[in-house]
A protein has these predicted regions:
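A short helix->beta-strand "capping" segment at the edge of beta-propeller domains
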Residues: 24-38, 72, 140
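Beta-strand-rich domains and repeat architectures in extracellular enzymes and scaffolds
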Residues: 30-61
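Residue-level detector of Asp-centered blade-edge/turn motifs that repeat once per structural unit
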Residues: 45-46, 93-94, 153-154, 195-196, ...
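Hydrophobic beta-strand positions that form the internal "hydrophobic ladder"
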Residues: 50, 98, 158, 200, ...
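A flexible loop/linker signature enriched in serine peptidases of the S9 family
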Residues: 53-63, 78-85, 101-127, 141-148, ...
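Short loop/turn segments that connect beta-strands within beta-propeller blades
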Residues: 66-70, 130-135, 171-174, 216-220, ...
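Serine-hydrolase catalytic core recognition
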Residues: 382, 389-709
Length: 709
């Protein structure tokens, strides 16, 4: 008979099945997750300062740091863990106001997330706040519904997008009402002002194709530039405002989701159009083969218009995502960032003669900051190196300071600034002296061998106080994505910052933890990312998890009968794959919002996906799913899911629990009403991780005869 255990049952069980006592110095998960997490660093257009958003125990605020002291100062005063995240900060042209987005976008039913069940509901909106408020009236004011604020580079206008339409308002007029700039078909994105702030470029997505549009603000005249049957995106203005460059991906059948795509039938291209005449021409096109697919990076635009009339862009010609540049007049592309490693984030310096970026060249399981010349006239120079992790660099408008985020194995993410030739230093106020740094462990890089022979990178966390001869329970963590990579330290993404904290906490509770960078993730090149038969085309990455399990089983410090799995999203998929196909190896698992049937997972993103029209693909997709092998699933599992998940449908967990109950598998569950995929509330992360740890303690910490703990 089946047995489904609710959290009330869990709490009762804990009273009689508490784990072995732990040292009082062990860190608490609330403290680990409560450390401020900074994100979205932007440089002021004047004065040499920076701004960013930080979340501390779920409370979101906007911060600034200005020279010469560069001490952090909050410019908003939100106080609640209410799930209303801040994002997309941008400076006004005079550097005196910050605009930002508050809240998350609506789901298909038109409802914005409300995980705190606020009585009046929620709505995503664009807000503005002065960086030096003089009165309470000058605290953040709401400009209107929407997101993606784009202040003009001159004057006081700001534009943004609401439900695919462009809106605009004058920041200098406190009583001004926002107005829709133009009524246009399609869904607008990638807003970009002309240098003189008279026109606004954007991409218009029409579903099957997309255009580049330009609106003259004063007259509201709308024109589409070089329209075609293809997909145009990423418009960027020339420095003199006379031309726009953009990327063109040529019309082709929609590529399969969660399937390898190493090449495109028609390689992507860069085109330039004269805004006045409409004359357009192709200035560069990718070669056939590797790099023919446009693979993006974290940047304000995939094409950056640099000094010397050169265009900077990402290209995977070598099998690694690198930066290249080409003259706007056309010609061959020049590689700017050679070597084995991937560029992940890039921005131009204020003089546009250089690009500052982060990459994993020479240190594949970390990130460091580099600078390269736009013309490729010299080798890139490393700004940071060593055992730290540094990312998202941006240079001050003055050119005298570079700010970036930094962490290491023990020190959580914080803001750092480097001025002149001085070593980088933490920005005052972005690190807590109370954080339990000394009680964390340093993960060790290890290589494991998948069951098909593929070498796989992983990080091993050993519990403190592990003695020779002891055999501890062990856990494998699988990240989500799958386009992700776990690092040898605190992660640069919030979701995986939390996962790293969880792995540290589990190690402090006595577990050997192995974090696996399975195939189809990033950081190791195109062939690894676009792995043969991964995802819906065969689930080949499951072989990496099996190899990791066998690696742990072979270790003298691991009890082979007490190996578990945990992960979220794609990691939840791999957790479920392990339990459904190898319950003899994996004794228990915690599955956060996992994909359990690829056909359902694809339909979440493509509602028009029809398994009856794509029968062969759909059959293979199901065979690559946990539900296809649920008959051999015997190990207990904890399912955790928010019911407003827009990435992995809540029905995925409903279908799985139904199948497991029919087969008598022990299932526990934790559900968060109105919560999304990447939990918006700190309290929900804490509760979920506590439930996961309690589950593993009860399932894996009981001592089998002859074993030691």
């Amino acid at each position: 008979m089946h047995r489904t255990v609710t959290l009330l049952t869990v709490c009762a069980a804990l009273a009689v099945a508490s784990p072995a006592p732990r040292a009082q110095s062990a860190p608490d998960i609330d403290a680990l997750l409560g450390a401020p997490f900074p994100t979205e660093l932007v440089a002021a257009p004047t004065g040499g300062g920076f701004a960013w958003i930080a979340s501390a125990s779920g409370v979101q605020n906007l911060w600034v740091a200005e020279p010469p002291a560069f001490a952090a100062r909050a410019v908003t005063a939100y106080r609640d863990d209410d799930g209303q995240w801040l994002s997309q900060p941008a400076w006004s042209a005079d550097g005196m106001t910050l605009v930002f987005t508050r809240g998350e976008g609506p789901n298909r039913e038109g409802a914005s997330p409300n995980p705190a069940q606020l009585a009046d509901g929620t709505e995503q909106g664009v807000w503005a706040t002065p960086i030096r408020p003089q009165t309470t009236r000058e605290t953040p004011r709401r400009l209107g519904a929407g997101n993606s604020p784009a202040p003009a580079p001159k004057g006081s206008m700001v534009a943004w997008i609401d439900r695919g339409q462009i809106w605009i308002v004058d920041l200098a007029e406190p009583e001004a009402k926002p107005a829709r700039l133009v009524v246009a078909r399609g869904s607008a994105s990638s807003l970009g002002w002309s240098p003189d702030a008279t026109r606004l470029a954007f991409a218009s997505n029409r579903g099957t194709h997309s255009f580049i549009g330009v609106v003259t603000v004063a007259t509201r005249e709308l024109r589409y530039l070089d329209p075609s049957l293809d997909r145009d995106s990423n418009p960027v203005w020339s420095l003199d405002g006379t031309r726009i460059a953009f990327a063109r991906e040529f019309a082709a059948p929609r590529p399969a989701m969660f399937a390898p795509r190493r090449t495109a039938e028609e390689p992507w291209a860069i085109r330039i159009v004269d805004v006045k005449t409409g004359a357009a021409r192709q200035v560069w096109r990718a070669d056939q083969g590797y790099g023919s697919v446009l693979q993006g990076l974290d940047a304000e635009n995939q094409i950056l218009w640099g000094a010397g009339d050169r265009l900077v862009f990402p290209w995977e010609k070598s099998g690694w995502l690198h930066l290249y540049s080409v003259a706007a007049g056309g010609g061959s592309a020049t590689e700017l960032t050679p070597g084995d490693g991937e560029v992940e984030h890039a921005r131009l310096t204020p003089d546009r003669a250089r690009v500052v970026y982060h990459a994993n060249h020479g240190d594949i399981d970390r990130r460091h900051v580099w600078v390269a010349r736009v013309d490729g006239g010299a080798a890139p120079s490393a700004v940071t190196k060593g055992t730290g992790i540094e990312w998202a660099p941006v240079m001050a408008e003055t050119g005298t300071a570079t700010a970036f985020f930094r962490s290491d194995a023990r020190t959580p993410p914080h803001v750092a600034v480097q001025t002149g030739e001085m070593p980088a230093r933490a920005v005052e106020g972005t690190l807590s002296a109370a954080f339990p740094t000394a009680h964390l462990v340093e993960p060790t890089p290890v290589m494991v061998t998948a069951t098909d022979g593929q070498p796989i990178h992983a990080q091993l966390f050993l519990p403190p106080g592990l003695k020779p001869g002891e055999r501890r329970p062990a856990l494998i963590f699988s990240h989500g994505g799958s386009r992700r990579q776990m690092l040898l330290g605190w992660h640069y993404m919030y979701y995986y910052r939390n996962a790293y904290a969880m792995n540290q906490w589990l190690a402090s509770r006595g577990y050997v933890v192995l974090s696996v960078n399975y195939r189809s993730g990033i950081g190791y090149g195109l062939e690894f990312r676009e792995a043969v038969n991964f995802g819906a085309t065969g689930g080949s990455e499951f072989q990496d998890i099996m190899g990791a399990g066998l690696y742990l089983k072979s270790r003298a410090d691991v009890d082979p009968s007490r190996i578990g799995l945990w992960g979220g999203s794609y990691g939840g998929y791999l957790t479920a794959m392990g339990l459904s196909r190898a319950s003899n190896l994996f004794a228990a698992g915690v599955d956060f919002h996992g994909v359990h049937d690829w056909n359902q997972g694809i339909r979440t993103f493509r509602p028009d996906y029809n398994t009856l029209e794509e029968t062969a693909f759909a059959r293979k997709a199901f065979e690559s799913s946990p539900l296809a092998s649920v008959d051999t699933w015997t190990s207990p599992v904890l399912l955790i899911h928010g019911d407003d998940d827009r990435n992995v449908s809540f029905v995925e967990s409903i279908n799985l629990i139904t199948a497991l109950r029919k087969r008598g598998v022990e299932v526990e569950q934790l559900v968060f009403p109105d919560e999304v995929h990447d939990f918006l509330r700190h309290a929900n992360w804490v509760r979920a991780y506590q439930a996961a740890a309690d589950f593993f303690d009860r399932r894996l910490k009981a001592k089998p005869s002859g074993s030691q703990q």
